[in-house]
């Protein structure tokens, strides 16, 4: 008879898995700009942010830690680039807006806990599982999780800034497994990114589940993820864990 799998650790992505922004980035940026006397279209800022974020992440990955930057400075530079691409050339006028945005994005009021997150985390705890965060976030994450009432569910929070490696780098997953003192085969990761979360965890021998994010899934991605690994919502996780652990006994 096959040995029944008993998971011991669940690691979690955060943004668009457990939390999401209450308002789109462009709206947040435009609102703060208006409070400082600067009128910029939210749509233009949203588009500029996507372009600036991609460029900044490619030039200075993982908050520029390898280039001598702090995550704080990385974000201030990104805000400056966003406004510049949206047509605002006055860096001095943008500076206080950037500082305010950095502070506001640290606040729990900017974030919303996704439906089913708290109940699912409680359910996982009742199963005796260790829970941890593995997120490509910066040092503000601990305070954000504390502020929205989710920090108490986790044994530890591991950010890419603290670890030194962003997902899908296998080293951040190995570090989480080391901190939890469990083997990959009894760990599972939950997140909304196919590359960073689903594939990243599987590359180190963990199980993983893909959460439906705000954007439609690429059909090719959906075809490559078994139905039992796909979570239309967080409330589907506990039944998926039952199926995973039960299926090992049926092998």
From Swiss-Prot:
Task: List the Gene3D superfamilies hit by this protein, alphabetically.
Answer: HAD superfamily/HAD-like (3.40.50.1000), Haloacid dehalogenase-like hydrolase (1.10.150.720)
Which Gene Ontology cellular component terms are annotated?
A: nucleus
A Pfam family it matches: Hydrolase
Q: For the modification N6-acetyllysine, which residues carry it? A: 15, 130
N6-succinyllysine: residues bearing it: 15
| Listed PANTHER family | HALOACID DEHALOGENASE-LIKE HYDROLASE DOMAIN-CONTAINING PROTEIN 3, PTHR46191
* Family membership: Belongs to the HAD-like hydrolase superfamily.
Name of the protein in its database record: Haloacid dehalogenase-like hydrolase domain-containing protein 3
